[in-house]
Amino acid sequence: MSELILQNNNYLKGRLVIFIGLMLNALTLVSCNKINNMFKGNNTKFHWTPTVAAPRNYPVETGYAVFIYGDKKVGYPVMETRFARGIGNPLSAEDFDAPGSVYELPKRIRVLWLSITEQKYYKADIEIPAEVQDSMLHLFQKGFYYPIDKTSEEYNTIVLTLLPGGKMWLTVAGAGKRTLVCDNLKATETHVDFKDFNKEAYECFSTMQKYCAAALGDYDGVKENLEEVGIPFDLWDVYKERFNYTIKIDFENNKTELDSAYTSYEFTNTDFLYDGDKSPLTMKARPFHIGFIWLVDHYKYTGEFYFDEEEVINVFREAFNQKHRKEKGVLHIHISKYNNRFDLSLNVGKDEYKLKHTNIYVFKKRIGSTSTKEEVFYDNCRDVDIDELNFLGF
């Protein structure tokens, strides 16, 4: 029996024993980002679900993906096998456990996957570095503040993002926040008998290469993107770069009120949080999307700002060059008196770098209106579908 089949059977059996026992209550790392948080509570077991993610333009199929936890090294398998919903995306998580079931956080990851665009297999059987385990424990123990509901929330999903070239990221997620905890895990290219990897696909296509070519058609635009752009293996190294900057939003009309509870930031390294979060980021990756609400003259305005990938990469690279890498910057969004002009810039030291190609949507609604509809007040990208605003490697 092949190693692939043994891996699947052993881990699924181990997991099944836990399900029954609880009566359904339930590489080498070069550098990983460490999250510094204070402990609150001493829990070491939590209700969590593992999942896998991959870029929309670079889908993967897993032979197995197992998160190993506990002294008995029990495996928690990811049941879904196809992934292309986006980096750090937790939506593929399938939680079959009862709400009260809790487990220790994972210590090891075993994964085998087929990179469909590369037509290559990658494999990893690696210990999660101790500092990353500590970071996850701190985050799960502390949870996070969700300013919209003014509630304390919990992390409940651990996302393994599989990238071209065998790179892997670990992100922890909850309803209202995502935090990248490790960005430098690495798998190695390997050889697998395609018949063992996917027997049904083997019977239909006979070879992995034919299967991958056909599978590209399952994803909108992926084949065309591959032909036009190829695979930018170093792009995700750019995405994970962090800089010391703050985000400032202000208005020409000083009577305008920013509803900070709804101000959200999404970054290129999968980090996502609200401005009212009580554990704000000091070092941030480049922004991908910023959304916020402001109130003025009896109207509520909702703004969605999607940054241009090429521009935001180049501007941050130039502003935080080797000479200014350690300086603190300010990403400034200024809104005009009539809410229809938007000046965006990155300011580092005495230098200002304009961001002129940001895609902006603004919706308007009268405060107190019972209508569920919002008027499109401003749109500088009318001919662009919102799905097209995703970055290449997202």
Q: What are these model-predicted stretches?
A:
Residues 1-13:
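N-terminal secretory signal peptides that target proteins for export/translocation
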Residues 30-31:
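C-terminal motif of bacterial Sec signal peptides marking the signal peptidase cleavage site
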Residues 124-135, 141-146, 304-317:
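Short beta-strand elements
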Residues 37-68, 93:
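An N-terminus-focused feature that recognizes amino-terminal "leader" regions
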Residues 39-54, 228-249:
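Contiguous beta-strand segments within globular domains
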